Amino acid sequence: MHVTVGELIGNFILITGSFILLLVLIKKFAWSNITGIFEERAEKIASDIDRAEEARQKAEVLAQKREDELAGSRKEAKTIIENAKETAEQSKANILADAKLEAGHLKEKANQEIAQNKVEALQSVKGEVADLTISLAGKIISQNLDSHAHKALIDQYIDQLGEA
């Protein structure tokens, strides 16, 4: 199959003309629709990118806000713990001071009671010794004793004193 140069040029002109006609028809009837679709698609992509950027920024803001709140909560918890420790230390100091004061009062009261009991015991013993001395002196005077009888009488009264 031989193709001549004239046929080739004719085919070339026909194909080129058909292509130009196709471009003109596309430009007249479909080009605005095609470019509209591409523009809508480009706008949608740009809008999606903008929304994604806004969402990322909001997420960063929320993350920072949560981080700040967490730091604030930690600081507040630390303050509460420190206040509780201070309150506990103050309570401990107050309780110890009250206990020492109460112990001092109890010790002082016990010492006073001991001193009072000692004074009462001494007065009682002095009274009994005085009574015994008077009684013994009366018996000695009423009885004229020799030294041996005198010693026996004193021993007898000492034994009675020990039993009382």
From Swiss-Prot:
What exactly does this protein do? F(1)F(0) ATP synthase produces ATP from ADP in the presence of a proton or sodium gradient. F-type ATPases consist of two structural domains, F(1) containing the extramembraneous catalytic core and F(0) containing the membrane proton channel, linked together by a central stalk and a peripheral stalk. During catalysis, ATP synthesis in the catalytic domain of F(1) is coupled via a rotary mechanism of the central stalk subunits to proton translocation.
Pfam families annotated for this entry?
ATP-synt_B (PF00430)
Q: Does the keyword Kinase apply?
A: no
Q: How does it assemble?
A: F-type ATPases have 2 components, F(1) - the catalytic core - and F(0) - the membrane proton channel. F(1) has five subunits: alpha(3), beta(3), gamma(1), delta(1), epsilon(1). F(0) has three main subunits: a(1), b(2) and c(10-14). The alpha and beta chains form an alternating ring which encloses part of the gamma chain. F(1) is attached to F(0) by a central stalk formed by the gamma and epsilon chains, while a peripheral stalk is formed by the delta and b chains.
Q: What is the lineage of its organism?
A: Bacteria, Bacillati, Bacillota, Bacilli, Lactobacillales
Stated family: Belongs to the ATPase B chain family.
> Carries keyword Ion transport?
yes
| Membrane topology reported for the UniProt record | Single-pass membrane protein
Concerning what turns on (or off) its expression, the entry says:
Induced by a decrease in external pH from 7.5 to 5.7.
Q: Where, by residue number, does the polypeptide cross the bilayer?
A: 6-26
Q: Report the GO molecular function annotations.
A: proton-transporting ATP synthase activity, rotational mechanism
By which gene is this protein encoded?
atpF
What PANTHER family does its record include?
A: ATP SYNTHASE SUBUNIT B (PTHR33445:SF1), ATP SYNTHASE SUBUNIT B', CHLOROPLASTIC (PTHR33445)
Q: What is this protein called?
A: ATP synthase subunit b
What organism is the protein native to? Streptococcus pneumoniae (strain ATCC BAA-255 / R6)
Its subcellular locations are: Cell membrane
Entry's Gene Ontology cellular component terms: plasma membrane; proton-transporting ATP synthase complex
The main location class comes to membrane
